[in-house]
Amino acid sequence: MGLIVISRGIDLSEVAIMAGAWSVALIEMQNGVPILGGVLIALAIAIVIGVVNGVMVAFVEAPALFVTLAAGFVIYGLAFWFAPAWVVYAPKDVPRLTFLGAGHVFGVPMPIIVFLLAAVAMHLFLSRTSTGRFIYSQGDNPEAARMAGIALRPLIVLEYVIVALVAWLAGLVWIGTTGSMQMAITQGTMVFDVILVVVLGGISLVGGRGGVFSVVVGCALIGTLLNAFTIMDVNSEVQNIIRGVVLLAAIILDNWLHPRDEETARQGD
């Protein structure tokens, strides 16, 4: 999500991509498809959805907010039609997946290692490649980036594919940790937690600012908040109120710190 926001976009379908792609893949594994085949099925589904989202935003020029919101509902409906269960379990005896979610290397849990490796890879991509610099240019001033010769439409498609790949990787770790995929998460607050991670981490909603370190900070803050909810036994209704207030406050603060001038706002809309 952070990458999309840096580019002045948004993707509300990320959680649905994770749950939908892996629910279908787990059903196929239960039907006899090898583990590697199931992993590739989930990967293919995620990539296709990312391409469709990107094409709708870049070439059809539909608003990203509504495209990805609609995509989330479509993914949920199709996945639940194909795998009509709130919880789809992974086949038994899959040590590689189990190790990925519950294993340790030198005492460090594998999910943390996967997260750090993905964060480093994304940091290098954004900071050391021309494509990464183009993404920042797009978020800072789309019209100037276009006049500089940057092909924004293919770049936007690539951004949504990358987000889908991150969702696929998150699902892989999720299954390794829990041994299942829960379609119910598409109807919960996880998508708002993802947005909170981005906003609280300091990635500007007007685009062009922030980075991987911002996402790491946001993850730490949200992790602390969720742990506090658990320790204090805060009920779900109050949790949602707090989430909403924190998100609104963070958006107002971001808008105050990074105001969009009239010309830039017009170019990005």
Residue map of PLM features:
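Hydrophobic core segments of alpha-helical transmembrane domains in multi-pass membrane transport
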Residues: 1-2, 43, 72-79, 114-124, ...
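Single transmembrane alpha-helix segments in multi-pass membrane proteins
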Residues: 1-31, 55-61, 195-213, 245
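Membrane-interface helix caps of multi-pass small-molecule transporters
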Residues: 3, 27, 31, 51-59, ...
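Alpha-helical transmembrane segments within multi-pass membrane transporters and channels
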Residues: 32-72, 217-218
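Helix-loop-helix "hairpin" substructures at the membrane interface of multi-pass membrane proteins
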Residues: 34-42, 47-53, 104-182
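Transmembrane helix-bundle core of multi-pass membrane transporters
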Residues: 64-128, 155-158, 177-187, 238, ...
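Cytosolic-side transmembrane-helix boundaries in multi-pass membrane proteins
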Residues: 120-121, 140, 147-154, 225, ...
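Transmembrane alpha-helical segments in multi-pass inner-membrane proteins
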Residues: 167, 178, 182-244
